[in-house]
Amino acid sequence: MSGHSKWSTIKRKKGAIDSKRGKIFTKIIKEITLAARLGGGDTEGNSRLRQAILAAKNENMPRDNIDRAIKKGTGEIGGGESYEEVTYEGYGPGGVAVLVEVMTDNKNRTVAEIRHIFSKHGGNLGGNGCVSWLFEKKGSIVFDRDLIDEDALMELALEAGAEDIREEESQMDVITDPSMFDKVRDVLEGKGMKYVQASIEMVPQNTIRLDEGKAEQMLKMIEKLEDNDDVQNVYANFDIPDEIMEKLSA
């Protein structure tokens, strides 16, 4: 299982998503605001805003919150900080490649906090380009294997233009080119196939398998990174054997 899918699974098992819903809302609102500021408030011509609103709806964010964030971005209402996007790259325990996407109003503060988290958990922050070449931007649509017809999903996804379907222990991950993401998701959703999550993200080309000690370190590091208010997304190219995953998520 890929690092991103693995981390999503353990968060659901631990109930971390519900306990940190307020923090998730804050991150999504920042993304909606910036997307609207950069590309306007019309979702038809702004795919980034469309993805941000999809993420908000997946978290059951009230429509008023979404609309207010869009209006802040377009300047219809005032308020809000001016954020800058930065991607930090580095290595985690066991040489795992890590990408950290942040949205910050103070780069000096943020880079110091990110560097501290890397160092404290057996990693080190690197320079621009040190690991980004190990990832590709892809659409990812994840389904619970117990809730879908796997054969039908594979057939429909490939016919709609999906590039690949990755089978995990409990999930199926439909991978698309970013330009085909909306089409494939809409086709599958139109056929009644409900996904667990859908987003455009950085997918690792290869993964590094971790032992129990390194896996525990890695998961703690990602948890601390995601808990940082400025961090929007974390991607890593690790793999954890299912038996170790079960032990760590117990």
Swiss-Prot record:
Q: Which InterPro entries match?
A: Integrase-like_N, TACO1_YebC-like_2nd/3rd_dom, TACO1_YebC_N, Transcrip_reg_TACO1-like, Transcrip_reg_TACO1-like_dom3, YebC-like
State any GO CC term: cytosol
- Which biological processes are named by the entry's GO terms? regulation of DNA-templated transcription
Q: Which Pfam family is one of this chain's hits?
A: Transcrip_reg
Q: Name one GO molecular function term.
A: DNA binding
Q: Which UniProt keywords apply?
A: Cytoplasm, DNA-binding, Transcription, Transcription regulation
Its annotated compartments are: Cytoplasm
Q: Can you tell which superkingdom this protein's organism belongs to?
A: Bacteria
Q: Where is the signal peptide?
A: none
Q: Which Gene3D superfamilies match?
A: 1.10.10.200, 3.30.70.980
Asked if Transcription regulation is a keyword of the record, the answer is yes
**PANTHER family noted in UniProt:** TRANSCRIPTIONAL REGULATORY PROTEIN YEBC-RELATED, TRANSLATIONAL ACTIVATOR OF CYTOCHROME C OXIDASE 1
Q: Which family does it belong to?
A: Belongs to the TACO1 family.
What name appears for this protein in its UniProt entry?
A: Probable transcriptional regulatory protein SYNAS_07390
